[in-house]
C-alpha cells in the first residue's frame, strides 16, 4: 500500500463518495458497501474509515486506527532516513611543486577520508606561470591516484577548470 501523506487521504467525514470497496481491520475484503454502512462499521469497531485508493472504481476504503497508522508510517520513514548513507566530498588541495613530505601528509588525509567512505576531490591550483606546466600537475595527480588505487577508484579523470586541475576519487566499496 503506497500512502504518502495526509493530504492524499480522506478520513471519516471527509469521504465524499456513495459507495466504497471496504477492507477490514485485518486486511480482509468486506465487499462493496454504501458509505453510510462503512462508516457505521467503523464507528462500531471504534476505528477510522480511511479512503486509501480514491482513483479505483469503486474507491477503496479501509478500517484502521489512523493515529496508529500515521505513527507507524512516520517511524518507518525515520528509520529509512537513518539507513541512508550521506556521501560527502572532501577536498585535498595540492600544488604542482609539492614537496615529498607534504605530499605524503595530504595523501594520508585523503586515504583517511576514503576509508571513512567519503569521496575525495584532489585539486591542484596553478599560480602565476605554473599554468604553462600542466604536465607537472597531471603527474602529481597521477601519483596520488596510484598511491590510493588499493582503496579507491578514479570517478572523474584529471581535467582542467580555469587555473585548477582536479580529479575525483571514490572508495572501492561504493562501486561493488
UniProtKB/Swiss-Prot annotation:
Top-level lineage group: Bacteria
Location relative to the cell: Cytoplasm
SUPFAM superfamilies assigned to the protein according to its UniProt record, in alphabetical order: Translation initiation factor IF3, C-terminal domain (SSF55200), Translation initiation factor IF3, N-terminal domain (SSF54364)
One CC-aspect GO term: membrane
One Pfam family from the record: IF3_N
Any one Gene Ontology BP term: ribosome disassembly
Keywords: Cytoplasm, Initiation factor, Protein biosynthesis
InterPro entries (alphabetical): T_IF-3_C_sf, T_IF-3_N_sf, Translation_initiation_fac3_CS, Translation_initiation_fac_3, Translation_initiation_fac_3_C, Translation_initiation_fac_3_N
GO molecular function: ribosome binding; translation initiation factor activity
Family: Belongs to the IF-3 family.
Subunit (UniProt): Monomer.
Biological role stated in the UniProt entry: IF-3 binds to the 30S ribosomal subunit and shifts the equilibrium between 70S ribosomes and their 50S and 30S subunits in favor of the free subunits, thus enhancing the availability of 30S subunits on which protein synthesis initiation begins.
Protein name in UniProt: Translation initiation factor IF-3
Gene name of this polypeptide: infC
Amino acid at each position: 500500500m503506497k500512502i504518502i501523506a495526509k493530504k492524499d487521504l480522506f478520513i471519516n467525514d471527509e469521504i465524499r463518495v456513495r459507495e466504497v470497496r471496504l477492507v477490514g481491520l485485518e486486511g480482509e475484503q468486506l465487499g462493496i458497501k454504501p458509505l453510510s454502512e462503512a462508516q457505521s462499521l467503523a464507528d462500531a469497531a471504534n476505528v477510522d474509515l480511511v479512503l486509501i485508493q480514491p482513483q479505483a472504481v469503486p474507491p477503496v476504503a479501509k478500517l484502521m486506527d489512523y493515529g496508529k497508522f500515521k505513527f507507524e508510517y512516520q517511524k518507518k520513514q525515520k528509520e529509512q532516513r537513518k539507513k541512508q548513507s550521506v556521501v560527502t566530498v572532501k577536498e585535498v588541495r595540492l600544488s604542482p611543486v609539492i614537496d615529498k613530505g607534504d605530499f605524503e601528509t595530504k595523501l594520508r588525509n585523503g586515504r583517511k577520508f576514503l576509508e571513512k567512505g567519503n569521496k575525495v576531490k584532489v585539486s591542484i591550483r596553478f599560480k602565476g606561470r605554473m599554468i604553462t606546466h600542466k604536465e607537472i600537475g597531471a603527474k602529481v595527480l597521477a601519483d596520488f591516484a596510484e598511491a590510493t588505487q588499493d582503496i579507491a577508484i578514479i570517478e572523474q579523470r584529471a581535467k582542467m577548470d580555469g587555473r585548477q586541475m582536479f580529479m575525483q576519487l571514490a572508495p572501492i566499496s561504493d562501486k561493488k
